């Protein structure tokens, strides 16, 4: 089954998405997501200029060989642009292979390891009262795992805080330059345990409670944070400190038993090898769109399973519904599954990407359609052209550039 075309689409039905469509001489097509938030055009260019021309004529069934060709053949490898492109190709080829087998992808991977995929949602607010209202709404929808973020008194902007009441959190801003935000670690460390106390006092311990620190703390500050929230039994604290300094997680481990999740910015198994091998984390956050597709994620998950590290894949709506569909198939199969992030998508987005997944009482299922179970409406997508948007940058209150 030969590949006869590979096309790249950049569309913005509310957010910018990069979609790869591979077509074979049998008529079967496959879809892949190559979205890299704020850097969509470089990935699209890499696909168009370097990847798509080299796909033509290749056997679509040779997924592993094609993966190795674009990984080893790149020479300048493992970067986010290269790996996002490889991920999209890999996703599309698995979509084709599962369609050729006339089975949903999770069956081709080895079958279901569970009846549904537990997903966690996002709650947000400018105050604790707003967060409690938002939490109640998501709990009533059936979510069993809920991420909690809140505005911090004395700070105009805080990671995870929606720009208006009732709005979903959207970090990227339209325009030609990134937004600059101010950050105070002391204000954050003083306030955030009070947020978790309020949530547990009102709702108890029935739901899993998650929190994202988004690389903002130093190792000793992260240790202090983890110790301060142990009574509230967080499911995890995410990205407490920049993961480039992987040895520092040993220090955090020595001070707290709050579970740690890391890895949404990782692009390969090499990025997380030390953290997993030394059991410095509990959940690996790599995502199918950035870590080498289904093939790359299988390697990471298999390695992590040796050390009882579970998956907790990054999955906000800055990755397209194609990634979400692929993630749900992967999550349903992978033995060492932990939880899957799910922010939901707007009606506009789902019109461009019709899907077959379902949500019921806190769990999702990818559906039984052959392949990924998702489609792409090219004509509708063309009505939503690329719209430049950038993730913010952060500074301390004295103006020092900090980790966003």
From Swiss-Prot:
Its EC number is 4.2.1.-, 4.2.1.8. Its cofactor is Mg(2+). The active site is at 159 (proton donor/acceptor), 214 (proton donor/acceptor). Mg(2+) binds at residues 212, 238, 264. The keyword Membrane does not apply. Substrate binds at residues 37, 122, 264, 285, 314, 318, 341. The keyword Metal-binding applies. InterPro entries: D-mannonate_dehydratase-like, D-mannonate_dehydratase_GalD, DgoD-like, Enolase-like_C_sf, Enolase-like_N, Enolase_C-like, Mandel_Rmase/mucon_lact_enz_CS, Mandelate_racemase_C. It catalyses: D-mannonate = 2-dehydro-3-deoxy-D-gluconate + H2O. One of its GO terms (molecular function) is magnesium ion binding. It holds the Pfam family MR_MLE_N. Gene3D superfamilies: Enolase-like C-terminal domain, Enolase-like, N-terminal domain. Binds 1 Mg(2+) ion per subunit. Keywords: Lyase, Magnesium, Metal-binding. Belongs to the mandelate racemase/muconate lactonizing enzyme family. GalD subfamily. Has low D-mannonate dehydratase activity (in vitro), suggesting that this is not a physiological substrate and that it has no significant role in D-mannonate degradation in vivo. Has no detectable activity with a panel of 70 other acid sugars (in vitro). This is D-galactonate dehydratase family member PC1_0802. It comes from Pectobacterium carotovorum subsp. carotovorum (strain PC1).
């Amino acid at each position: 089954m030969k590949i006869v075309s590979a096309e790249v689409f950049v569309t913005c039905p509310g957010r910018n998405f990069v979609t790869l469509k591979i077509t074979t001489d049998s008529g079967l097509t496959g879809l892949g997501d190559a979205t890299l938030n704020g850097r969509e055009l470089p990935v699209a260019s890499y696909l168009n200029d370097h990847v798509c021309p080299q796909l033509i004529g290749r056997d679509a069934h040779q997924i592993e060989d094609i993966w190795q060709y674009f990984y080893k053949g790149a020479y300048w490898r493992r970067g986010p642009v290269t790996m996002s492109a490889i991920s999209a190709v890999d996703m599309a080829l698995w979509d084709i292979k599962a369609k050729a087998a006339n089975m949903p992808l999770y069956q081709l991977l080895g079958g279901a390891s569970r009846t549904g995929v537990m997903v966690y949602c996002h709650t947000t607010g400018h105050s604790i009262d707003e967060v409690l209202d938002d939490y109640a709404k998501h709990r009533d929808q059936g979510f069993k795992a809920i991420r909690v973020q809140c505005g911090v008194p004395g700070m105009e902007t805080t990671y995870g805080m929606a720009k208006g009441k009732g709005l979903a959190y959207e970090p990227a801003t339209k325009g030609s330059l990134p937004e600059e935000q101010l950050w105070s670690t002391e204000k954050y460390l003083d306030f955030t345990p009070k947020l978790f106390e309020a949530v547990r006092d009102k709702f108890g311990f029935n739901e899993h409670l998650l929190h994202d620190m988004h690389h903002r703390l130093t190792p000793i500050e992260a240790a202090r944070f983890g110790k301060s929230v142990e009574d509230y039994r967080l499911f995890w604290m995410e990205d407490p400190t920049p993961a480039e300094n992987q040895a520092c997680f040993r220090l955090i481990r020595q001070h707290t038993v709050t579970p740690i999740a890391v890895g949404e910015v990782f692009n390969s198994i090499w990025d997380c090898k030390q953290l997993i091998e030394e059991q410095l984390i509990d959940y690996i956050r790599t995502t199918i769109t950035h870590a080498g597709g289904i093939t790359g994620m299988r390697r990471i998950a298999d390695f992590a399973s040796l050390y009882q590290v579970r998956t907790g894949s990054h999955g906000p709506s800055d990755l397209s519904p194609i990634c979400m569909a692929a993630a749900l198939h992967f999550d349903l199969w992978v033995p060492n599954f932990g939880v899957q992030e799910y922010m939901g998508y707007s009606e506009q987005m789902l019109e461009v990407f019709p899907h077959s997944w379902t949500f019921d009482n806190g769990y999702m299922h990818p559906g039984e359609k052959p392949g990924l179970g998702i489609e792409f409406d090219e004509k509708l997508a063309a009505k939503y052209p690329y719209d430049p948007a950038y993730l913010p940058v952060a500074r301390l209150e004295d103006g020092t550039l900090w980790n966003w």
